[in-house]
């Protein structure tokens, strides 16, 4: 079991090295939120190309839990990677001056995710780095992400891993206990949690996804019906934009 896990981790690190070398970039930038997904992605990057080439960016807003920033700082110190903090409230305030601006949790959450993506790519462009994605398979299959926001990246090291697999690997690379034990949250508004918003635990989501994939995407339980409905509604997030471009 340990050998199999080591092989799977080695494959991820090799993919990161390939993306890095092939791009001729000078490093990697990863948004470190204080959550387990970004923690594991950052750890993989440090293991693959060395922590001195990896920049961790925390992009909190006033609604963010202060403990998340503290956990992100601890993670970066443990991994030996550089850490910077950019508060996104001034950018949010600028958007709120747009005539007709409407503020709802849904609209503001998507806006925050896209602002964070823009800041990550600004630093990547400035420092000749790649942006590392932090989406896992469970989120990707459900479409639990912001299009052109937190799903935007130059490579995705953990998108093939179910959330339950993420926890398994995070324990293996010694991610801090505070990160492993916290409630998963996108941090888009105070008190928000992934499982509360979706209405299922990640254990239930992953079990449903595995059963659906094994049974030709035919739901057999209420949980599977809920997961399938969400996956179908958000299929556009997993696909390229429709187009008529033909490349020989």
UniProtKB/Swiss-Prot annotation:
Keywords linked to the UniProt accession = ATP-binding, Ligase, Magnesium, Metal-binding, NAD, Nucleotide-binding
One of the protein's GO biological processes:
NAD biosynthetic process
The record's annotation in InterPro entries points to: NAD/GMP_synthase, NAD_synthase, NH(3)-dep_NAD(+)_synth, Rossmann-like_a/b/a_fold
State the organism named in the record: Methanoregula boonei (strain DSM 21154 / JCM 14090 / 6A8)
| Protein purpose | Catalyzes the ATP-dependent amidation of deamido-NAD to form NAD. Uses ammonia as a nitrogen source.
Query: What reaction is this protein's catalytic activity?
Result: deamido-NAD(+) + NH4(+) + ATP = AMP + diphosphate + NAD(+) + H(+)
The protein's name: NH(3)-dependent NAD(+) synthetase
Origin: domain of life: Archaea
The enzyme's main class, written as a single word, is ligase
Gene Ontology CC entries for this record: cytoplasm
Q: Which gene is the coding source of this polypeptide chain?
A: nadE
Q: Which residues bind ATP?
A: 31-38, 134, 163, 185
Question: Which residues are listed for deamido-NAD(+) binding in this entry?
Answer: 114, 147, 154, 236-237
């Amino acid at each position: 079991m340990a050998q199999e896990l080591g092989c799977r981790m080695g494959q991820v690190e090799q993919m990161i090295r390939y993306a890095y070398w092939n791009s001729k970039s000078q490093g990697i930038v990863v948004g470190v939120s204080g959550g387990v997904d970004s923690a594991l992605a950052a750890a993989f990057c440090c293991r693959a190309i060395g922590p001195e080439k990896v920049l961790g960016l925390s992009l909190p807003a006033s609604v963010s839990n202060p403990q998340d920033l503290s956990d992100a700082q601890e993670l970066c110190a443990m991994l030996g990677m550089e850490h910077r903090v950019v508060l996104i409230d001034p950018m949010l305030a600028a958007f709120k001056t747009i005539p007709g601006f409407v503020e709802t949790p849904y609209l503001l959450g998507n806006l925050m995710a896209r602002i964070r993506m823009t800041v990550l790519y600004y630093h990547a462009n400035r420092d000749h780095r790649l942006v590392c994605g932090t989406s896992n398979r469970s989120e990707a299959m459900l479409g639990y992400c912001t299009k052109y926001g937190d799903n935007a990246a130059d490579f995705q090291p953990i998108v093939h891993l179910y959330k339950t697999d993420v926890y398994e690997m995070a324990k293996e690379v010694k991610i801090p206990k505070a990160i492993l034990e916290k409630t998963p949250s996108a941090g888009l508004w105070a008190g928000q949690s992934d499982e509360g918003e979706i209405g299922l635990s990640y254990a239930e989501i992953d079990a449903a996804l595995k059963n659906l994939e094994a049974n030709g995407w035919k739901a057999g339980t209420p949980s599977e019906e809920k997961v399938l409905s969400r996956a179908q509604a958000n299929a556009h997030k997993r696909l390229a934009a429709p187009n008529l471009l033909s490349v020989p």
